[in-house]
Every structure is written in structure tokens, then in C-alpha cells.
From Swiss-Prot:
InterPro entries: Aliph_Amidase/BUP (IPR050345), C-N_Hydrolase (IPR003010), C-N_Hydrolase_sf (IPR036526), Formamidase (IPR022843). PROSITE patterns: CN_HYDROLASE. Is an aliphatic amidase with a restricted substrate specificity, as it only hydrolyzes formamide. Transmembrane segments: none annotated. This is Formamidase. The keyword Hydrolase applies. It catalyses: formamide + H2O = formate + NH4(+). PANTHER family: FORMAMIDASE (PTHR43674:SF15), NITRILASE C965.09-RELATED (PTHR43674). GO terms for biological process: putrescine biosynthetic process from arginine. Belongs to the carbon-nitrogen hydrolase superfamily. Aliphatic amidase family. SUPFAM superfamilies: Carbon-nitrogen hydrolase (SSF56317). The gene is amiF. The keyword Hydrolase applies. Its EC number is 3.5.1.49.
Length: 334
């Protein structure tokens, strides 16, 4: 079940390409326009070099960068849909590929902070999935918590796609939500620096294994004069093994063959370690059909809006003041 990548379309399944886009240095709207041109050029070049590719993925922050002094300013924000997403849609249609792109999205409510958003565009140039990051990387990220849940859409080669953004991938419940809604290929786009490199690799594998689904993950690469972004695009099999692992090179293209039917077959035919099923059917050998209530306190408390850790009252950091953000909520950083 290994993969060394490919230039051609497999007979079944599909070929994916994850682009380790160089971390953008963005100081003006002109720089954003340049990034968009670069992303579109790279999309077309990737299709030309890998003619069988059907899904091309770009990392978080590849469009607008990570200039923390300006990333909340109106100059740096985009709309979804908007002029810029139309350019991406045109490129996907011309190249006849699915594309995954990152957008820092202006909040329709002008009184609140922007969203960190991912979109999937199909080969007809239509936005078929829009996801807003549910778990911003607090306390450093100022994005408003996403309000669209975890959508799933049809993709190439029998795939059902979902996208999470960077820190979302550290939340196992979110990967489980995607799988519970039918996802068999879980995409993660990130702008992480090296502090969490090992944890990135670990969670990409565990998200695959716990849910019997492929994971395809890609991070920015390079140095932005403060942090180094590690690249290391990773494709994991549904059994949690790594099929392809990128390096730390900016512009590296990590490719691999994905066979969604194999993940689907595992979900249907496995007994041992079919854990996404076992969660809701505990002890089904002794009790026909199993016990449907897992008895998990935190799930019940989350559902009731009462989630609270035993040590929560004693925690030192529960707002963004360490990074200079106000603690009153509402729109800031315009």
C-alpha cells in the first residue's frame, strides 16, 4: 500500500499534489496580488509537470501571508466569493483540477474579526466547499471562530473531501466529525513553524488511523525573518502509516496516489480496530448492536455548553493579551 508519487493518473483513485509554498513576505496589497499570480502560475505548472494530477493543495496563509502587524487590516482581507477567488476558480477550470486554497476572509459582520477560511474549487470552476477555521491557534491568532461546521464534499476518484486548517488538526474530535460525515480524504493546510514539527507528523498519522481515512497535509516552507516553516507535506494511509513525506524545501511538490475505495472497504470489512464504529457500539459481541452511549462526560458537557476543565480556573493564559490583543472582544486591528 506504499506510494512513491506519480506523474500519471492511477486507474482507480486519483493523484494529489501538495505544494510547499514559500512563506510569503507580505507588506502591501500589491504583495498579495503577486502571491495570487504565483499560486495560479504554480497550479498550471504543476498540472503540466504532473498531467494526471486531479487535486492540487496550497498551504494556509499562502495568499495573504502572516504579517501580524497588518493581517487584520482591511487592506489585507478578501471576500469569499470575491475577485480573487474568481481568479482561482478560472485557473482550476483551465487546468481541469480541484484546488484547495487559503483565504483570510472579511467577516460579513463588520463588528467582528475576520475568518481564516479554506475553499475547494472543482474543475468546473465552482466553489464546492467553504470552511472557516473552527479552532484558531490561540492565543496568537486573532481569527473569529468558524461558524460553518465541518463540511464534506465529493472529490475525484470516489473521494469525499474535508479540509481542516493548521491547529484544527490537533483536535482529534474534528477529524472524527469529518469522518462521521463520510470524509475518506482529510486535507490539512497549515502555516506552522518548527515548534510543532513532530506533533504535526504525529497528528496527521493519528487522524488517519483513528478514522480509517487518508490524510493529505501540507505546510508553508522557508524563513520569514522570524520563524522557519517546515514544509514536510505528508500523505498518510488509512492505517496510519506514512505513504509520502516531504522535506523542508520551499517549492517542493509532494505527490501521491490515493485510493478512497480502500478506505471505504476497510470501514465496511474490518472488525478489529474499526474504532470509528466501535465508539458508538461498545461491546457488540456481548450485547447485540452494542452500547450506544459511550458515557463520555466531556461530550455531554460540550453538547450542553458546559465544558470546563478541572484546572480551568487556575490557568494563566485564556485571552490574547500576551500578544497585545484587547480582551473585550469585537472588531480590532482594522
Amino acid at each position: 500500500m506504499g506510494s512513491i508519487g506519480s506523474m500519471g493518473k492511477p486507474i482507480e483513485g486519483f493523484l494529489v499534489a501538495a505544494i510547499q509554498f514559500p512563506v510569503p513576505i507580505v507588506n502591501s496589497r500589491k504583495d498579495i496580488d503577486h502571491n495570487i499570480e504565483s499560486i495560479i502560475r504554480t497550479l498550471h505548472a504543476t498540472k503540466a509537470g504532473y498531467p494526471g494530477v486531479e487535486l492540487i493543495i496550497f498551504p494556509e496563509y499562502s495568499t495573504q501571508g502572516l504579517n501580524t502587524a497588518k493581517w487584520l487590516s482591511e487592506e489585507f482581507l478578501l471576500d469569499v466569493p470575491g475577485k480573487e477567488t474568481e481568479l482561482y476558480a478560472k485557473a482550476c477550470k483551465e487546468a481541469k483540477v480541484y484546488g484547495v486554497l487559503s483565504i483570510m476572509e472579511r467577516n460579513p459582520d463588520s463588528n467582528e474579526n475576520p475568518y481564516n477560511t479554506a475553499i475547494i474549487i472543482d474543475p468546473q470552476g465552482k466553489i464546492i466547499l467553504k470552511y472557516r477555521k473552527l479552532f484558531p491557534w490561540n492565543p496568537i491568532e486573532p481569527w473569529y471562530p468558524g461558524d460553518l461546521g465541518m463540511p464534506v464534499c465529493e472529490g475525484p476518484g470516489g473521494s469525499k473531501l474535508a479540509v481542516c486548517i493548521c491547529h484544527d488538526g490537533m483536535i482529534p474530535e474534528l477529524a472524527r466529525e469529518a469522518a462521521y460525515k463520510g470524509c475518506n480524504v482529510y486535507i490539512r493546510i497549515s502555516g506552522y513553524s518548527t515548534q510543532v514539527n513532530d506533533q504535526w507528523i504525529l497528528t496527521n498519522r493519528s487522524n488517519a488511523w483513528h478514522n480509517l481515512m487518508y490524510t493529505v497535509s501540507v505546510n508553508l516552507a522557508g524563513y520569514d525573518n522570524v520563524f522557519y516553516y517546515f514544509g514536510e507535506g505528508q500523505i498518510c494511509n488509512f492505517d496510519g502509516t506514512t505513504l509520502v513525506q516531504g522535506h523542508r524545501n520551499p517549492w517542493e511538490i509532494v505527490t501521491g496516489e490515493i485510493y478512497p475505495k480502500m478506505a471505504d472497504n476497510a470501514r465496511l470489512s474490518w472488525g478489529l480496530e474499526n474504532n470509528i464504529y466501535n465508539l458508538g457500539h461498545r461491546g457488540y459481541v456481548a450485547k447485540p448492536g452494542g452500547e450506544h452511549d459511550a458515557g463520555l462526560t466531556y461530550i455531554k458537557d460540550l453538547a450542553a455548553g458546559k465544558y470546563k476543565l478541572p484546572w480551568e480556573d487556575h490557568m494563566k493564559i485564556k485571552d490574547g493579551s500576551i500578544y497585545g490583543y484587547p480582551t473585550t472582544g469585537g472588531r480590532f486591528g482594522k
